[in-house]
Amino acid sequence: MITTSSDYKTIRIVSLMITHSCNLNCVYCFEKHKDFGKRMMSFETAKEVLQKEFDLFKTMERESNDRLAIEFFGGEPMMNFELIKMVYEWVKGLDLPFPMMFQATTNGTLLTESALEWFTSVKNDFRIVVSIDGDELMHAANRGVSMSKIPTDYIVKNWPNSYFKMTISKETLPRFSQGVIELTTKGYRVTSSLAEGIDWDKNDANTYKQELLKIASFYLENPQYKIEQPFDLTFDKLRYDTDVPPKNCGVGTKTLIYDTDGQSYPCHLFVPVVHGQEKVRKVVDTIDFYDDKCMINDHCLKCSINKLCRTCYGYNYLDRGDIKSRNLTKCKMLLAELQIISSFQVQYFMQRKGSLNLNDIEKLSDALSAYELLHNTEFDFD
């Protein structure tokens, strides 16, 4: 069964890097080895790797509502659109004995009328995730192209539960709240995150804090809008009784990406188009991604908020040659984020104290614990 219904839980994500080519050149792009047309995944390669994944998923311990997700990735996956259609039709004909879904992550500029017509015909089986980096000025600054090239209203109409991904760069940070609020009031679901690979400074952290405060106030004053990332993050990891915090994503365990030639890698930040062919195999072959101790160094292990810290292991290796070596210029950005969001969640749930369910009460308790830990925390390094 193929379904995007929220009644099912995705427990494994298999991404297909179906092309290294892209029609844009975003300011924060991590794919430094793009080849513009030379490397495309073939239908035979896609079938081979997916059949292997299907056979594996059949044998996994799972609940009846546990789902496998197949994601089309790039580059810009719409530059190999024919493969997307071929893979979908092939998989649909297999009548697999477990739930699954498809997802395409795209910049949206190549969603032609004919492509949209096809996606609409299979919209209950596909989730479309489009990158929009805020308002028109923010999007143009990051991506060098107008938002008018993206059929946003059409996407919202046909995929009301899909979301737009906003990446915040140094250039767009001062307009962050404006971008989120503008898109939200238009009826768009927007998740946001800081760009990786950037040297942030104290002024950036102060700006980020003020922008987060504006968004928090907007959500509290406008309860009709759904809370989105990062404001919906959970603080339950504070309850974990462990000396080594669990890694903050499913890299190499719950996620896997197959490059155009069918070779597998831990995630899309560990593929040759990011690091180059020789460099990436060295780390992939030597790291045990199931061992959390391999993902953090002694410096970060001593940090009082390491259970809440989020890092990108692929970027750590790309920028500093070590998956354990985190971007310390981002620490104050993350601290600002955690301080504002824990405080926000306490206020948010207290506004609804008469109608909280058990899950909400648990989230409120976790947010209170986080607030107590974080509100007086400071980092004394630049």
Language-model features: locations:
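N-terminal [4Fe-4S]-dependent radical SAM core
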Residues: 1-15, 60-65
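Flexible mid-to-C-terminal extensions adjoining Fe-S/redox cofactors in radical SAM and related proteins
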Residues: 271-382
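Canonical Radical SAM [4Fe-4S] cluster-binding loop centered on the CxxxCxxC motif
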Residues: 6-45
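Cysteine-centered iron-sulfur cluster-binding motifs in ferredoxin-type domains/subunits
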Residues: 18-25, 76, 252, 300-302, ...
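Exposed loop/turn and edge beta-strand positions of beta-sandwich/beta-sheet ligand-binding modules
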Residues: 12, 66-68, 252, 299
